[in-house]
A protein has these predicted regions:
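Gram-negative bacterial Sec-dependent N-terminal signal peptides
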Residues: 1-26
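Surface-exposed loop/turn motifs in large extracellular/passenger domains
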Residues: 28-227, 231-277, 281-378
């Protein structure tokens, strides 16, 4: 009898130790950065988690994170960090300044992060102590050997903040997937909404690995610098459902809706740029990627740059049902509606094409055929 009681106490103690290992105090950062040694490690949080603090990385001199997982090697053994229910990260403490890049969620070397539930909510308004440094606020970051799986129905990322004592010199990126295909850097999500108000450079989604998502909504305003809605340097192509990008650059004109070096496919794309110069840009030095929009492609650009283009594809440019392009380039030298570098670039929109181009020199189409029926060119 005494032996059975002792065994129960031992089992209960082990269970409590495991629960403590995988629990988090309200607001505390979660850091699973370590040398993994000789085996994989797994951490799981079954309840909803809310975090409002970040900690500086013990392995990277330039990083501070609210949620982080990764190792320094360990012969390739992995760390896996899972959240079964809603995860909320809210970094908005004006007294917590840092000179590091700040990551709300960061998957480092050999790390897998799984996020479930209904909502992943991220606010990164971290304050930077060095106004002359090019530090960045990140929503989600994945390294070259990481995997990020977001099964939550919705992911919302809000970016802001500034340098301590100054309203300038900081940058923000919603999602940075820095992977190498067939090696790592896999990112999977459902519905993504990214918003931002900033003074410096902005990228909604920056991908060089394998990236998959359903619907994407990116809306941001910046005082100066450069802005991209989506910047894709991965070679595996992108395939989305509905994409909406609305960006405003108050000073300057280095503003692009989507730039991709591989095939881009979507059901519908809507791009609205204030002081932008390129709506869609699909090109690569080694190949001729295609742009395929199955439904409607809507582009609205007001620009003060020397030239502007609504949509450009080095390969085929295909629009399935409806094409609307409006470009106010009254301060520009050249205004281009849609452009394809090959003679059989085509739009299937046919009877549902409307282009309004304003500028001293306008080119509605270049090497793009299929404009018939009720096409309206003004």
């Amino acid at each position: 009898m005494r032996k059975q009681k002792l065994e129960r106490v031992v089992v209960l103690s082990l269970m409590l130790a495991a629960l403590q290992q995988n629990s988090v105090l309200a607001g505390d950062a979660i850091s699973k950065e370590e040398y993994t040694g000789d085996k994989d490690k797994y951490y799981s949080y079954q309840d909803a988690v809310s975090i409002d603090k970040f900690v500086e990385s013990q392995f990277s001199y330039k990083a501070a994170s609210a949620v982080s997982a990764g190792s320094t090697g360990g012969n390739g053994f992995r760390i896996e960090l899972s959240f079964d229910k809603n995860l909320t990260v809210d970094l908005d403490d004006p007294t917590a300044a840092t000179d590091k890049d700040v990551y709300a969620v960061r998957a480092g070397n050999y790390a897998t992060i799984n996020i479930g539930g209904e909502l992943l909510s991220i606010t990164n308004n971290a304050i930077h102590s060095d106004p002359n440094d090019y530090t960045v606020n990140y929503g989600i970051y994945g390294s070259q050997t990481s995997k990020i799986n977001i099964t939550a129905q919705n992911t919302e990322i809000n970016l802001g903040g500034n340098s301590q004592g100054k309203d300038e010199t900081y940058n923000a990126t919603g999602i940075y997937n820095a992977g190498i295909e067939n090696y790592g850097g896999d990112f999977l999500a459902k519905n993504l909404k990214i918003t931002g108000m900033m003074q410096g450079n902005f990228i909604g989604i920056n991908n060089s690995g394998k990236f998959a998502a359903d619907n994407i909504d990116i809306q941001a305003v910046s005082e100066s610098g450069s802005m991209y809605g989506i910047k894709n340097t991965g070679t595996g192509g992108l395939d989305f459902k509905d994409v909406n990008i609305e960006l405003e650059l108050k000073s300057g004109y280095a503003l692009t809706g989507i730039k991709s070096k591989s095939n881009l496919t979507a059901d519908n794309i809507n791009i609205k740029l204030q002081n932008g110069n390129t709506g869609l840009y699909v090109t690569d030095t080694a190949s001729a990627p295609d742009l395929l929009v199955k439904g409607a492609l809507n582009i609205d650009i007001v620009t003060n740059s020397e030239s502007a283009v609504g949509a450009y594809a080095k390969g085929k440019l295909t629009v399935g049902k409806e094409l609307n392009v409006f470009i106010d380039g009254s301060k520009s030298f050249n205004v281009n509606g849609i452009v394809s570098d090959i003679d059989d670039g085509i739009t299937d929109a046919k009877d549902n094409v409307k282009m309004v181009l304003i500028g001293p020199r306008v080119f509605y189409t270049t090497y793009v055929v299929g404009f018939t029926g009720n096409t309206l060119l003004e």
